[in-house]
Amino acid sequence: MSSILKIFSILLCVFMFACGSSPDENNETPDENTPAEDSDAVTPDNDADQSDTDTSTEKTDEERDNDADTALSDEDKVENDDETTDGDADFEELQTGGIYIFSDFDESGSAKSRNILGNGGFLGFSIFSLGKKYWAVSAIHESIPAFDWDNATGRLYIFEKNKHVESLDDAAFVLNHPDKSLNVGFGYTAAAPCDINGDGFADLAVSSHLAAFGDLYAAGEIVVFYGSPDGWNEETYSISRLSSAYIQKADSMSQSLACVDYDGDGFADIFAGGQNAGPELSGGGSQGMVAFFKGRAAGLSENESWVLLPEVEEKAQYFGSSMLIEDLDGDSLPDLVISGWGLKSDKSSANSGGAYIYSGGTDWQHGATHKIFGEAGSQFGSALKTIEIGGKKYLAVLATKDKNYGTVNFYDPAEDFAARGRFSFPSAFAEEGNISDFDTIKLSSDTDLIVIGGKNFGNGGMTYCATISNKTISEPEACKFQPESPEGGFGNAVFNNKNGEIVVGMPEYIHRF
């Protein structure tokens, strides 16, 4: 019996990078699933947007059946792989996607592992935080029912940070696009839960950055699930998108999301980024844009109130590709960071990528208070995260094309975002690929581990680890905890779930059975 290959092949209408992650996040870096401006399939090389969020929905019996047996042990995986080495063997293949969870780290960087397979649809494409209580994993092309590729809507799995996770059934909430819209990239990222309508319950704004509006493909939209005593469901929601003044094809609006009560009126507001959005420039193209959507008693406003744009009026800067909002400098006021992996410091400079920082307590419409830029062509700003090293908080920025393989750059918010070192591969490093995502985890009181994922490293993705102690970063080496033969885009997303664990996405994983 010939093998039956049931792998869904997606036309990734993307923006010039292979995201993986970001998806973020929020995770995020430039995204394989974000359309390139005026193009049907162009991308950078990474993913993500790491954001903070919450969600709620009760699984049906059919969904529970589909999720059954998704947690595959390492031993089972090896056994299944061995069974397929015989050319005459009968087996089936399903593109499930999945995640690895690594726990119980020792001081050497070794850890225990378990993995969870998805129901198709690139589970593990992006992994990100949803505030203090939850973390989420996206399956941006999952279908209802599972593996029915003609009905791919996307799905978001939300887990509690203090709960042990063994399978998708352990999700506190599972959300689908409430309109069951197809191929919209639902769940790519989400904002931290916040009270948008002022009723005392946290609401959840979720990305649907590939959603069409009429003939405008991938214009993007924000789906808000309104909270209740039981969390979120697909019955109470609203959809917001750009107004006619801005909306265009391939905007990818909501590729990045952040929530804060910006104007202090008691209603949380949403900032939504789209790396291809913004007014069309005289020579064609756009800069990228972040739009402000106002919270109110009736829910999130249908359209934007105002927008943020790069200071340099040049196309292809991808402003809004990643975003985070957090108190970075310890003054109890939220700071906003927006990156664009093609930003320019001035009209005459090359597209290096950069990040604009809007300090809390200032009028963000009047411009950024700090700006940082990378080297020419480095795609600096592909992903943004805050990390802790030695108990101190840093802004970490990924430059996917810097120094051949990518670098992670650290900035100190307490010192006006002064550069404080970076992770990079040594000159003798001889792999192919680029960094997709990264995060850190504490090994001991004086040692942190930085985990670097690259979905294109090796034959199916890899993670590399380096210790950080006394402000010194060790030479990176293949992480001791990763599978012997990683595959399926392993390392596309890397995330510390704040439960003493590192979660790694492998969205292209193929399950053989």
Predicted regions, residues:
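Sec-dependent signal peptide recognition
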Residues: 3-10
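C-terminal motif of bacterial Sec signal peptides marking the signal peptidase cleavage site
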Residues: 17-18
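Ser/Thr-rich, Pro/Gly/Ala-heavy low-complexity intrinsically disordered linkers and tails
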Residues: 23-90
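Acidic/hydrophobic-patterned starts of short beta strands in beta-sheet-rich repeat architectures
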Residues: 83, 132-138, 198-207, 264-273, ...
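Blade-edge motifs of beta-propeller repeat domains
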Residues: 90-122, 126, 134-135, 146, ...
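Beta-propeller blade termini
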Residues: 125-138, 188-198, 255-264, 321-330, ...
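Short glycine/acidic-enriched loop and turn motifs that connect beta-strands
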Residues: 141-147, 210-215, 276-281, 342-347, ...
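Structural signature of WD-repeat beta-propellers
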Residues: 151, 208, 217, 274, ...
